[in-house]
């Protein structure tokens, strides 16, 4: 006979309440109103004993999931701790410094009763942790739990892959000087399957809009900002970078297995829960964090980032992914790139499609839109008129002609009406001839050269730099006629001595040609550099700190040449005293020419004249050549006159 035992049934009721009772969570935090989880829970104790026996809290993947690093592995790390700075990421009060305590707290959280809002449960918020622990331990069958927000965001059933998007450099913003990286989640969803509608992950600094440029640079360099991940549809990033800032975007599909895609997607979701890191422009930036996220695809010690590195550059991450290969039989990790051209590139290509008469008509319409009714414009055949008006509309968008007067609005309406009556043209704008960033030279460089100085004799020179690109280098996939070089260090060795001949902190130059391809359009060229250099080439130990910057004009007559004129302002000092600083101006004239892709020459001369401080007046002339051997090697020949004639023959290795 069945005997009713209140104590027996109360134990089952307690177990039911522990497993199925509800609670509430605050989005992005780990606080809960659920009943306290008992440390005596037999399921928890069994799993914890198993985890302790397997030493899971020391497993490389668990440390990856918590972003734990040892001393020197990550910038600002002086002890074994997590890079995450906000408490909401940790389920244990000691989780930031103790991975064992965080593992215990995670086990308790994933076994805790289901809450009213399933999205707040640890199995949904920390889905990467839960899935890895479940695959590593003998979990019992748990109550089914749907995660509506994650499922809607990830759309795993229709996911087709992950792409990394490289955004070209933007010299008007220091944080984007070396480019930017995005991570794009692709799917075949009928609503969000279009490339522009796909979820895209971004990492950036949480800046204060009231900070002036000096404070902005200072805080960015020394960790004064926090960084976080955000996600938006890809069209938003394409609009910001490609349309507003005229930056090319290169999309590289990643050859990950479905399981690897899931691992990356799981942790990406965790990072979107208001997780914050300390942001450093040169290291803890988008390049470092995006590469770190991709490392989640492997549950072992696989790294894409370099431990102990002092900088992280977006294009360097793309090169690392290109070289990355887990085995000799599988495909490379980085797939073939697709160019998403900037608004400026598309406009230039449209203008290039016009013949001389059509370009002349376009210039007239830019000056006076009412020329739409002129006999001259109407004399063009309809396809030509359509081409001209398409270029005109692109030009107006490129110039951001938005705040229109009433009359201009009427002219714009008329322009659109006229265009609507003309035939639709096949878009012949092509990007097939454009080379991707991974076809150019890698960003790091080692230099070995032999030097002969007319006064000081021969020497051996070694040097290194961290750069995005230099003016004389191969421009494949890089900003055209631009230079971004940092930390350019050069040492010279003579018989029984060595000397520091140069330590350039930064050297940024932009030689702007016609931005649209329309005759008469121009932008100012500009450049700036600063660092320690020799006072002149006739004195070996004479060094000074020199800062230079200026504006100029650049033109091209044949497409493979650039002629330029600059007026620079400069400051030179040998001491830290303000009174010892020489300030002056320096007009320059020069040219660059690349008759074939593997060969480029540059000539430049300048006259320096002081107007304040110790008087100085001198000329500097330089002639350089570059001959490309392979993608990773080139030869440079440099001849310079600065008090003494000096020649250098150097071999460069890029990696």
Language-model segments: which ranges?
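Glycine-rich catalytic cores of cysteine/serine-nucleophile enzymes that process amide/ester linkages
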Residues: 158-246, 464, 473, 491-503
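Repeated loop/turn-to-beta-strand initiation elements of outer-membrane beta-barrel proteins
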Residues: 469-477, 510-519, 556-565, 593-603, ...
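Outer-membrane beta-barrel initiation region
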Residues: 287, 335-479
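Transmembrane beta-strands of outer-membrane beta-barrel proteins
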Residues: 444-446, 462, 485-487, 520-528, ...
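Active-site nucleophile-His-acid catalytic modules used for acyl/amide transfer and hydrolysis
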Residues: 234-315, 574, 638
